[in-house]
Regions:
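Acidic-enriched and Gly/Ser
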Residues: 2-8, 12-127
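P-loop NTPase nucleotide-binding/switch module
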Residues: 95-142, 158-160, 196-205, 211-214
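Nucleotide-state-sensitive switch-loop elements of NTP-binding domains
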Residues: 179-222, 254-257
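Phosphate-binding/switch loop-helix module in NTP-utilizing enzymes
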Residues: 212-247
Length: 264
């Protein structure tokens, strides 16, 4: 991410942990992005003029006199019809070798819908899988968890749901995937000729675990765009939530915090 010449540069970090660094700064907002010694970071705590940044790649190699530049914005996603059929990382950048997305830039992680104002869920989302449609029915507007042992083929089940679901768009959020898992989904969707209605946000095991925490917000921001702006039926698939919980544990450990079970 490029920085602008007029942005203030801070060079005095007061505290560094394995995942965060703290410094005194002014005019900074919560969730704002920053560059710390060339590494992308995000504001996670503000107490007066003391700002704590979570560094996505970890703080290894960052000195106390490192240059810190705040970017003046929180994580965003460019939304348009061009998202369809593409694969992105946790920051919404293409990872499939295709062109950059042109569209409206919207912040992720916005306020959730007031549940009192929502309509009663009643519309079936058919998957063509009897065990799901009859015993664990997907209904538009609801969240349904799927539990599986590590040795069960849950990726194949997720791919089948994506291909068979009677929806306009499928948003896949992959967290902690192996490269084999990523290539499996990419090849299955491509071979089935279904890429034009599937949008994928992927964090692999080669990426920093902290980035997994952005995947659900990216996926839901894209889903909201197609559902609200285009009145389309959208199904969001997030896999796997165990990796998401592991990322929370890793972040808490690196921030020298005691992990509370309430977080997961």
């Amino acid at each position: 991410m490029a920085t602008k010449a007029f942005q203030k540069i801070y060079t005095k970090i007061s505290q560094i942990t394995k995942a965060t660094c703290s410094l005194k700064a002014s005019g900074v907002g919560y969730d704002e992005l920053a560059m710390v010694n060339g590494k992308l970071a995000q504001v996670v705590k503000i107490m007066g003029d003391e700002v704590t940044l979570q560094v996505f790649e970890g703080t290894e190699g960052i000195p106390t006199n490192a240059e810190v530049v705040f970017l003046g914005k929180s994580p965003t996603l460019k939304v348009s019809e061009q998202l369809a059929g593409r694969f992105f990382n946790a920051f919404g950048d293409p990872i499939d070798g295709g062109p950059e997305i042109e569209g409206q830039e919207v912040p992720i992680g916005g306020p959730s819908v007031n549940p009192v104002r929502r309509k009663q869920p009643s519309e079936l989302v058919a998957t063509g899988i009897a065990g799901i449609d009859l015993n664990n029915t997907l209904v538009s507007g609801q969240k349904i968890p799927f539990f599986a042992d590590p040795d069960q083929p849950f990726n194949q089940v997720m791919a089948n749901v994506a291909l068979r679901a009677e929806t306009d768009k499928i948003i896949l959020g992959g967290m902690g995937m192996t490269n084999d898992d990523y290539l499996y989904f990419k090849n299955v969707f491509s071979n089935a000729g279904a890429l034009d209605r599937i949008i994928s946000f992927v964090n692999t095991t080669e990426n920093p675990p902290v980035e997994r925490l952005l995947i659900p917000d990216m996926a839901l921001t894209a889903a909201e765009y197609f559902a609200v702006e285009h009145n389309q039926k959208v199904l969001v698939l997030l896999t796997d939530m165990t990796s998401y919980a592991d990322a929370l544990a890793i972040v808490s450990n690196r921030m020298d915090q005691i992990l509370s079970l309430i977080h997961i």
